[in-house]
UniProtKB/Swiss-Prot annotation:
PANTHER family tied to this protein: 30S RIBOSOMAL PROTEIN S18 (PTHR13479), SMALL RIBOSOMAL SUBUNIT PROTEIN BS18M (PTHR13479:SF40)
GO BP terms, alphabetized: translation
SUPFAM superfamilies, sorted: Ribosomal protein S18 (SSF46911)
Compartment(s) of residence: Plastid, Chloroplast
Family assignment from sequence similarity: Belongs to the bacterial ribosomal protein bS18 family.
A GO molecular-function descriptor: structural constituent of ribosome
Keywords annotated in UniProt: Chloroplast, Plastid, Ribonucleoprotein, Ribosomal protein, RNA-binding, rRNA-binding
InterPro entries: Ribosomal_bS18, Ribosomal_bS18_sf
Record HAMAP family: Ribosomal_bS18
Protein name as it appears in the record: Small ribosomal subunit protein bS18c
Species whose genome carries this gene: Gnetum parvifolium
Span list, region Disordered: 1-26
Subunit organization: Part of the 30S ribosomal subunit.
Length: 98
């Protein structure tokens, strides 16, 4: 039994040129926190940029914050919710289909 060299590259399927397997996701532009901006529950205008339309806290992937900034932001959002400066949930009215 003789061992022959097998060319794997010859049998590898080639992807069409210029095509991607998965489309790229479009994220919202990150909001940059300036050095003079303080992450505080009273700063509602800054906090509003870090919650979604459904009043959920956005992830670090979307906001591009550091670990420390994300933790401070989530604590500030939770405090603002308790003091009713921000809503816990956003109630949307659904249209009836019939």
């Amino acid at each position: 039994m003789s061992k022959q060299s097998f060319d794997f590259k010859r049998y590898k399927p080639e992807a069409p040129s210029g095509s991607r397997k998965r489309p790229l996701k479009k994220f919202k532009k990150p909001i940059r926190i300036k050095s003079e901006d303080q992450i505080n529950y009273k700063n509602v205008s800054l906090i509003n940029g870090f919650i979604s339309q459904r009043a959920k806290i956005l992830s670090r992937k979307v906001t591009k914050l550091t670990w420390k900034q994300q933790r401070l932001m989530s604590v500030a959002i939770k405090r603002a919710r308790i003091l009713s400066l921000l809503p816990f949930i956003v109630k949307t009215k659904f249209k009836k289909l019939y």
